[in-house]
Amino acid sequence: MDIFGIPIQAFMGQLMLGLVNGSFYAMLSLGLAVIFGLLGIVNFAHGALYMIGAYVAFVLLDKFGINYWFALVISPLVVGALGVVIERTLLKRLYKIDPIYGLLLTFGLALIAEGVFRYWFDVSGQSYPVPDLLQGATNLGFMVLPNYRAWVVFASLTVCLGTWYTIERTRLGAYLRAGTENPALVQAFGINVPVMVMLTYGAGAGLAALAGVLAAPVIQVTPLMGSNLIIVVFAVVVIGGMGSILGSILTGLGLGIVEGLTKVFYPEASSIVVFVIMAIVLMIRPAGLFGKEK
């Protein structure tokens, strides 16, 4: 059976690959949207935090024999703690000045992190094994679905929806949003706004690390893995609407699928389709699909 002249196995395979890539786009753009939407920082170090998260998982397994499931917890905590240190020592000094300084600082941090990890691990990729529980594939009849890729999609959707619900539908999320818009009022209720801001950045860094751990068995762990992805992720955030949590999730998943299907029908355009869509969206709706017009 063919779909538009393409064998269904090839079509569904690329669709699944697009959904997996979209899951990574969604998780990374989610962390960016959380940090920008709540703190107003354009975090160019996000790709580096993603890369560090993958390397933490690799080192835990290679040096200490700590498996994937523990790395899913430990790596986000380690990178989240690193994010807390970055926020307290560097970023907190920039909140009241032009946002361009935050962008330049985080861009510099990304270059430093990439250089350090290239020195420690070289540019050659490190392989990370798929955990035993998720090895193999399931035959669905019309396609063979790798179990690990199905897990990536499920885990990413769960984390994304959980984060969106926490920020948009809980009291904690209400405090976070209010703290960025009117810190003095929230402080009057006895809430420590600087600590809340610090933990928000740490949580965004942890989300990037979690995406890195999920990606490690799919792609090789390399110092360049973050810089190769971050431009696309920024495009996702811009298309979805800067600071829009739901917009980042839906746009990330949607663009991953579009990119995957483009590889089927017009492979030459697959590397630029996201940026073409971004240009079209910005011409029609400068605030993004889900962003608020100012």
Where are the predicted features?
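Membrane-interfacial amphipathic/re-entrant helices at transmembrane-helix boundaries
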Residues: 1-27, 56, 67-71, 98-101, ...
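Cytosolic-side transmembrane-helix boundaries in multi-pass membrane proteins
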Residues: 10, 89, 120, 181-188, ...
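Single transmembrane alpha-helix segments in multi-pass membrane proteins
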Residues: 10-61, 89-96, 101, 237-245
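Helix-loop-helix "hairpin" substructures at the membrane interface of multi-pass membrane proteins
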Residues: 21, 143-221, 245-251
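Transmembrane alpha-helical segments in multi-pass inner-membrane proteins
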Residues: 25, 29, 65-77, 198-208, ...
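Hydrophobic core segments of alpha-helical transmembrane domains in multi-pass membrane transport
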Residues: 54, 58, 76-82, 109-117, ...
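Alpha-helical transmembrane segments within multi-pass membrane transporters and channels
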Residues: 65-109, 116, 250-255, 285-286
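Transmembrane helix-bundle core of multi-pass membrane transporters
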Residues: 93-94, 98-169, 196, 220, ...
